[in-house]
């Protein structure tokens, strides 16, 4: 059996590792380095360069050099090179092919399978795009695992006889994740995760670039950011300065002949101190603190419960980052793992678990965001809450919103808001062929299934007819990094507003339900209801009908209560007169959350589908 490699497909650098003799080993690339720049370049002669050689010539070939493609994964954006458009998956596949070739040269055999890591906060389409990139590169991706989780495997493989709670702080080139894990008896259990898929070392570089450009503009009146070649030189100088300031308090930025004007060539020669760098990037560092707080809160832990802090990603070498983590946690971060290599090592360990080379290790990861469906009134009804251990499967029974409704459209949403419109729609599908029946009678079972890769499948089944429909969520390409972060932030900011909206919709749904029950009861009881009682209940129903579609929630509540009591009074009278055990009609005190048929499933919730008017 051929080896299964572990790959850290990073924004700025990538790394590959493999299990050998029971221990993980990082594989050096063809240039002798243990990490490979995630850079692809296209030459005039059609040649394609990947890695360090591509990065070296990026200054002279900026238009055809692609960097940080990971930030585009899962989007519909394409990169235009000459007369061809490349998807992010295709560019990522070129990087994976380079890593695969280096691994094959090292192992002396063909490699066809891999475990690839992704940021913990990657959404479904980004994970699927990563799998697709692997497939394009000729790799069967056995598992997609989260980067902080992989890092914890690298940290904890030799500590499996201890019980520890670990906080993994992962600040890479383009993404930031924080995960809280519990390690004990060989089980690596993720308790929670949080992060920002658009925060990383690139943003620190950009702060330096902007500072240099602004200083140059002040002195020379020229904005270097309008010159692609100059901009690429600025980026390279900014990255170099950032790295040097991790070990020294001052660095010199020297860029001769950066541009020219009528007076002659222009040069940059300036010093940048660590203090100035810290000032420029203070906001970025502070942006990493809130996700730590949220992750701890979601895990139900305080910072005092954490035994170890593990720093992952090259950007954690920045002294201000280390200081911020230490100040918040009150603990010195562990130095036991290499921040550039530990994610790939963890991926290799997971590969060993899958092949049986590594024994007695169990990895339990989580889904980062809540998944649910849109129900009547535009409410987002959750089926799988965020930070649920995966793989997982959850079913819930829903019903129809109209009599004889032939089909339902199921809108799958992802996010933390109470209203579906405020979350991201991942996809829609339709269940047809529902047997004609009154509203609320059909039982539509919706099932969410998240596999160990975090990829979602959704199915819907009419329990009456057995008719079934399903969808694998692969088209959620418009869910941007900002939208994911905004989903959680908005959920907190508008929590009360969302709660109020949902309560108001439930009040209106209850009003609709009691009107429906009243009409049904009057029809079923017929002449058994006296003219006086019928007139009274019709008046109360009319009063509710006038207000139920308005915005006066208190008026709707009062009118609903009045009609409920009137209906209860006549049905009680009918029971007393007939002595029957089960008069026709429904008990209005059951509320809208119960079905009128006695055999309602306990798993039925107070939520109906929208009518699919196109059917």
Swiss-Prot record:
PROSITE patterns, per the entry: HSP70_1 (PS00297), HSP70_2 (PS00329), HSP70_3 (PS01036)
Bridged cysteine pairs (disulfide): none
GO molecular function, one term: ATP-dependent protein folding chaperone
Keywords for the protein's UniProt record, in alphabetical order: ATP-binding, Chaperone, Nucleotide-binding, Phosphoprotein, Stress response
Span list, region Disordered: 578-615
Highest taxon, organism lineage: Bacteria
Chain ranges passing through the membrane: none
Record-linked Pfam families: HSP70
Gene3D superfamilies hit by this protein: 1.20.1270.10, 3.30.420.40, Actin, Chain A, domain 4, Substrate Binding Domain Of DNAk, Chain A, domain 1
Residues with the Phosphothreonine modification: 175
InterPro entries in alphabetical order: ATPase_NBD, Chaperone_DnaK, Heat_shock_70_CS, HSP70_C_sf, HSP70_peptide-bd_sf, Hsp_70_fam
UniProt induction comment: By heat shock.
Presence of the UniProt keyword Transport in the record: no
Function as written in the Swiss-Prot or TrEMBL entry: Acts as a chaperone.
Family: Belongs to the heat shock protein 70 family.
Protein name: Chaperone protein DnaK
Native species: Clostridium acetobutylicum (strain ATCC 824 / DSM 792 / JCM 1419 / IAM 19013 / LMG 5710 / NBRC 13948 / NRRL B-527 / VKM B-1787 / 2291 / W)
Gene it is expressed from: dnaK
